[in-house]
Amino acid sequence: MDNTRTAGAPPTRRRPLTLALGSGALAALLVTTALATGAGAGEPSGPGPGTQAVPRHAVTGYWHNFDNGSVIQRLADVPDDFDIIAVSFADSTTVPGEIEFNLDPVLGYTSEQQFKDEIAAKQAAGTSVIISVGGELGNVTVNDPASAQAFTTSTLALMDEYGFDGVDIDLEHGINATYLTQAMEGIHAATGDSLVYTMAPQTIDMQSTSSQYFQLALNTKDFLTVVNTQYYNSGTMLGCDGQVYAAGSVDFLTALACIQLESGLDPSQVGLGVPASPNAAGSGYVSPQTVTDALDCLTQGTNCGTFVPDRTYPDLRGAMTWSTNWDAHSGYAWSSVVGPHVHALP
């Protein structure tokens, strides 16, 4: 996902409030215990900020904390068709595994509190707002116990400070499934099942269960909300039938999603990630109608291309787009079609 910024004032940098969860000693003990023993180490601390459940069929959209020439969009202006908004992106620090968030002044907020109030308003309307980590330019390294703990602690701190409902993993420069699993287990142990936890791997990352991303998804499937694979900016890939498919078609979406659906993930944990407009990705754009056809094919066995799944998956979670800003740039041509269709799935 392209988070290249246009020239302008840099966002104000601020260290994450790593002890914002309460007593510093208590927060450190919680994280250390969770990382050492996993999510079952103790009782969760209770519901997170949003507490509302993600709908059975949901639409995820990435929101730009930067200006890349699409549309500068306030969080409040994201359409209600989106059930999960992934704020893009958190920033890395000099501490391995640690993240922080720096609101870009180009967005025009008069204060950070105004931004936080818009998060709360979205949540009050039933939308989950999460912090996304990674993107094309973002690189957060979690590859040992110390960096795993730093990721857990700093993510929980951002959730506490801004009210985020959870976290999205969009790391595109390689991950270590072992230690990122530990980090996510620590976050889940602290927040409980109110956590909204999404992933946006690239197509190559979900071709085989032996890949690090697929392993992370399977390791954390007990609390994973949805994997929205990016079915764009991709070369040809194998489908679950062993045939080769090219991006930009209904078959690419359905045949590749079938791999996840038949390899251990629950259908409710699988979503279709696509660009909102031709400008939003270098390649792989499909029309909103193609997205709805793919959804119908996988959930009901209708409107398929040449690939027809052996069975249907009525609980398929839905669709994702990069991004709400590019959607706005195209007059909401994507969300106005895909959103109602997802929400009307049986």
Question: What kind of region is each of these model predictions?
Answer:
Residues 4-9, 79, 299, 342, ...:
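Generic secondary-structure transition motif, activating predominantly at the C-termini of alpha-helices
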Residues 8-14, 33, 108-110, 176, ...:
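A ubiquitous, low-specificity "background" feature that marks scattered single residues
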Residues 45-271, 276-293, 310-316, 326-338, ...:
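Chitinase-like catalytic core of GlcNAc-active glycosidases
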Residues 294-295, 303:
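N-terminal onset of structured domains
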